């Protein structure tokens, strides 16, 4: 991370975990990016399917925009718009909708897609609850 890592907002931490997990094909790192309830769903089957890319690839996720979800709307927005589990939405203390570009480099080719990630603070930890 260096200086940039020190200055990065805490809500970006799970995005970096996700990026690193995909690049290193590490399901345990990915579990750090999501709520415990989601991590429980990540079985060996998911690990096998998820890392079905050749070893010669790299993904880069660049957040291009953010929108803070108003505290008063947080639970309702998470449940109604992003289908987050009620238990997680109820415990969320803050949240952001992040617009990002995910760029996959593989075999000299580059493919960029726009993605939307939703991050929330639950039990003092920022996690991704939508957009995986």
Which residues make up each language-model segment?
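Surface-exposed, charged secondary-structure patches
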Residues: 47-109
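Generic signature of mature, soluble extracytoplasmic domains
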Residues: 19-23, 27, 56, 107, ...
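Short, well-ordered alpha-helical segments enriched in acidic and aromatic residues
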Residues: 26-48, 52
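Short, low-complexity N-terminal intrinsically disordered segments enriched in polar/charged residues
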Residues: 1-24, 32
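Hydrophobic beta-strand residues in large extracellular and virion-surface proteins
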Residues: 18, 30, 59-63, 98-104, ...
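Hydrophobic face of amphipathic alpha-helices
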Residues: 11, 19, 23-26, 38, ...
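Short beta-strand edge/turn micro-motifs at domain boundaries
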Residues: 1, 108-132
